[in-house]
């Protein structure tokens, strides 16, 4: 599927599912550089979408736009994002936070919080002023920690954690927010392959059981082919291809995007294409 076509791949594969996030004709610039060009996408409930593409292709910028994040350096000259049919720019930030949980690519705290306190911050959209958090909020936070297999860290301070443990804490915070849309930008940077696998399986499980819409950027394209229900391949701010693995994960598309010669083989268990540079 080329960039000239509307990116309606999710409608094709999940036509009976409800659309909850729509991107229409987005054009965006950093100064004179066109970083997003004619972006049209629809995301549904109960879907798992992986964004792939080389460095600088616009993946992180697109996720920020999807979540309604204000970036004074980014000039959106055309297009809109609709959250459940409402222009996201007209929705209060706290209300957006009840619908979309966003984990950026790098996030550091300047204070040495307890792990449980960091995860509890996911409950902020539901807090009622000076009354703070409830017992239910604490239970939700501890459940999120348990799902990420780090409940044993809840009374540790974040400055004591390894990079991988800290990353798991941030993922738990996103789960604690209990939104229907989960947007994750390179969430596994510091995690070993075993923990990446477990967390990807957890996300797939939550999609199936809670009808979540997960949108995630991955540098490891083979992971995207294994776990992604839908793929979006970006290059230089343009959608090069969208669709299922069979549609997107082709020699022509990947070599065009990454400007590298790839060899292909089939995964022996998942029966999806995998690549290696050569």
Located regions from the model:
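Conserved ABC ATPase signature
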Residues: 132, 157-161, 165
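Catalytic Walker B motif of ABC-type/P-loop ATPase nucleotide-binding domains
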Residues: 182-186
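Conserved ABC transporter NBD signature motif
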Residues: 75-86
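Conserved structural motif at the start of ABC-family nucleotide-binding domains
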Residues: 21, 36-38
């Amino acid at each position: 599927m080329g960039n000239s076509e509307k990116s309606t791949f999710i409608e094709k594969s999940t036509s009976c599912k409800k659309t909850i996030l729509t991107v229409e004709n987005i054009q965006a610039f950093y100064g004179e550089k066109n970083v997003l060009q004619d972006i049209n996408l629809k995301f549904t409930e109960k879907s798992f979408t992986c964004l792939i593409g080389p460095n600088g292709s616009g993946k992180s910028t697109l996720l920020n736009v999807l979540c309604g994040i204000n970036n004074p350096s980014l000039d959106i000259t055309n297009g809109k994002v609709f959250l459940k049919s409402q222009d996201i720019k007209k929705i209060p930030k706290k209300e957006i936070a009840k619908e979309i949980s966003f984990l950026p690519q790098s996030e550091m705290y300047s204070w040495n919080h307890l792990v449980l306190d960091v995860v509890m911050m996911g409950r902020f959209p539901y807090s009622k002023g000076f009354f703070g958090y409830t017992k239910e909020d604490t239970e939700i936070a501890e459940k999120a920690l348990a799902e990420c297999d780090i409940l044993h860290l809840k009374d540790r301070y974040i400055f004591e954690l390894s990079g991988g443990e800290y990353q798991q804490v941030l993922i738990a915070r996103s789960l604690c927010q209990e939104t229907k849309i989960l947007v994750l930008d390179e969430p596994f940077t510091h995690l070993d392959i075993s923990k990446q696998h477990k967390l990807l399986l957890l996300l797939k499980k939550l999609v199936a059981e809670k009808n979540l819409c997960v949108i995630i950027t991955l540098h490891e394209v083979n992971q995207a082919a294994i776990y992604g229900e839908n793929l979006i391949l970006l290059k230089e701010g343009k959608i090069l291809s969208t669709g299922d693995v069979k549609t997107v994960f082709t020699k022509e598309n990947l070599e065009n995007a990454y400007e590298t010669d790839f060899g292909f083989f089939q995964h022996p268990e998942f029966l999806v294409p995998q690549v290696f540079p050569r």
